[in-house]
Amino acid sequence: MVLVTQNAPNFIAPAILKNNQIVEQFDLKKYSNGQSTVLFFWPMDFTFVCPSEIIEFNKLHSEFKKRNVKIVGVSIDSVYVHQAWQNTLPKNGGIGKINFPMVSDVKHDIQKSYGIQHPNLGIALRASFLIDSNWIIRHQVVNDLPFGRNITDMIRMVDALDFHNKFGEVCPANWKKGEEGITASSEGVSQYLSKYS
């Protein structure tokens, strides 16, 4: 299901916060508080590709934070399994302390509302959503289970959204922060593409 341009489905669910506090009523929209948010799903704790992605999101947390973007992760595991995973060192298959909320979707309602439940296994596919400050999904990527995400590309998409909002220009293929955009007109694209002639 493609959710880009749609309102993000809100949810209230148990979560473990960055201070290891467990809350029963984590409200995504309330937590986002008008800021852009990266919401990402992984299949299960204590598995194989998942810890590499979560550790990478955590490693780059400060890059998202300085762009005023919050990160929230979701899987079908209980908050107690999330907590145990955080309390396990990476060398032992854990993830260590994490600087963003990890939500528990034990009833699978959240992953179903985002349309990313695996059709046979009942777990989430590797999905990421960039929700803007107006609560609109602006970018989504969904990977099959064996394939890890490129977390730095999500930062690039955050930068592209910010660039478009500030300047009204569109971002060409492989655009990176600091590069020129394209004025969304026939003249603008002709001017941009003329450098390839």
UniProtKB/Swiss-Prot annotation:
GO terms for molecular function: NADH-dependent peroxiredoxin activity; thioredoxin peroxidase activity. Thiol-specific peroxidase that catalyzes the reduction of hydrogen peroxide and organic hydroperoxides to water and alcohols, respectively. Plays a role in cell protection against oxidative stress by detoxifying peroxides. GO terms for biological process: cell redox homeostasis; cellular response to stress; hydrogen peroxide catabolic process; response to oxidative stress. Belongs to the peroxiredoxin family. AhpC/Prx1 subfamily. The keyword Zinc-finger does not apply. It is found in: Cytoplasm. This is Alkyl hydroperoxide reductase C. Its EC number is 1.11.1.26. Keywords: Antioxidant, Cytoplasm, Disulfide bond, Oxidoreductase, Peroxidase, Redox-active center. GO terms for cellular component: cytosol. Residues 2-163 form the Thioredoxin domain. It comes from Buchnera aphidicola subsp. Acyrthosiphon pisum (strain APS). NCBIfam families: PRK15000.1. It holds the Pfam family 1-cysPrx_C. Homodimer; disulfide-linked, upon oxidation. 5 homodimers assemble to form a ring-like decamer. Gene3D superfamilies: Glutaredoxin.
